[in-house]
Amino acid sequence: VLSSADKNNIKATWDKIGSHAGEYGAEALERTFISFPTTKTYFPHFDLSHGSAQVKAHGKKVADALTLAVGHLEDLPNALSALSDLHAYKLRVDPVNFKLLSHCLLVTLACHHPAEFTPAVHSALDKFFSAVSTVLTSKYR
């Protein structure tokens, strides 16, 4: 459960990320593909090389979904319902991959914003990514 302090930290961090969200999303995807090669199996039709336009475009989709979630912290299930359906019924993404991407998102944000990445912010973002992952996998059951 996200506390009010967590929500404030998430919103403040996302405000600082601003126009870099798509760039960070792509970087986190690249980190995921390099660190956890099995995640590549969901993207057989993508050029997964560094700087690929397809990875950048998907990174922007990830960032846009997270931006949507930040704007709906009080009701993540409704805000992410369509994405949950997509990942559960059409894409059939193994739920563990959300944890792997979440970890890579945390690393990416920490690298770009080390001064702002306090323990409280780290904890809030970790809880947020976990909550988003839970919603995205909720329809698997």
From Swiss-Prot:
PROSITE patterns in the record: GLOBIN
Tissues expressing this chain: Red blood cells.
InterPro entries for the chain: Globin, Globin-like_sf, Globin/Proto, Hemoglobin_a-typ, Hemoglobin_oxygen_transport, Hemoglobin_pi
Phosphoserine modified-residue sites: 3, 35, 49, 102, 138
Annotated residues for binding of O2: 58
Residues bearing PTM N6-acetyllysine: 16
GO biological-process terms attached to the record: hydrogen peroxide catabolic process
Residue positions, PTM N6-succinyllysine: 7, 11, 16, 40
Modification type Phosphothreonine: residues: 108, 134, 137
Residue sites binding heme b per the record: 87
CDD domains: Hb-alpha-like
Limits of the Globin domain: 1-141
Keyword annotations of the record: Acetylation, Heme, Iron, Metal-binding, Oxygen transport, Phosphoprotein, Transport
Residues with Phosphotyrosine modification: 24
Function: Involved in oxygen transport from the lung to the various peripheral tissues.
Family assignment from sequence similarity: Belongs to the globin family.
UniProt subunit comment: Heterotetramer of two alpha chains and two beta chains.
Protein name (database record): Hemoglobin subunit alpha
The species this protein was found in: Paguma larvata
